A protein has these predicted regions:
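Conserved ATP-utilizing enzyme core subdomain
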Residues: 2-14
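Short, charge-rich amphipathic alpha-helices with coiled-coil/heptad character
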Residues: 11-26
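N-terminal acidic leader/helix
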Residues: 22-55
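Peripheral, non-catalytic segments of secretory and membrane proteins
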Residues: 28, 105-106
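Amphipathic alpha-helical packing elements
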Residues: 60-104
């Protein structure tokens, strides 16, 4: 039986040569998952806010709660990822003041 030795390219050289190390591949896959998850949360917010805009009268409290939960989850997820610019998101998604008030944001 012959023993195999493992040979690893130094990280400094790997970066300059553009060689993907296991760590780089893992980071890339994690970023892909984060982006996909954030996109899904954003679509959930869009859907919940559309339902809120269309819903008046009886049952609005439940729709408002669903929209608030979706927005809160989305904002928390963004903050965990280091994306802290709430004002741009509020403007982009057209998040109503009543939703932000329920979250407790100023």
């Amino acid at each position: 039986m012959t023993a195999m030795s493992s040979l690893r390219v130094p990280q400094s050289l790997a970066k300059r040569l553009g060689i993907e190390t296991g760590d780089a591949v893992l980071r890339y896959e994690l970023l892909q998952e984060q982006a996909a998850s954030l996109g899904l949360a954003g679509r959930k917010v869009e859907k919940a806010l559309a339902a809120l805009r269309e819903h008046e009268g009886e049952g609005r409290a439940e729709v408002l709660k669903a929209a608030t939960d979706a927005v809160w989850g989305f904002l928390v997820q963004r903050e965990i990822m280091g994306l802290r610019d709430r004002a741009a998101i509020i403007a982009e998604y057209g998040i109503p003041r009543e939703v932000m008030n329920r979250i407790g944001a100023r």
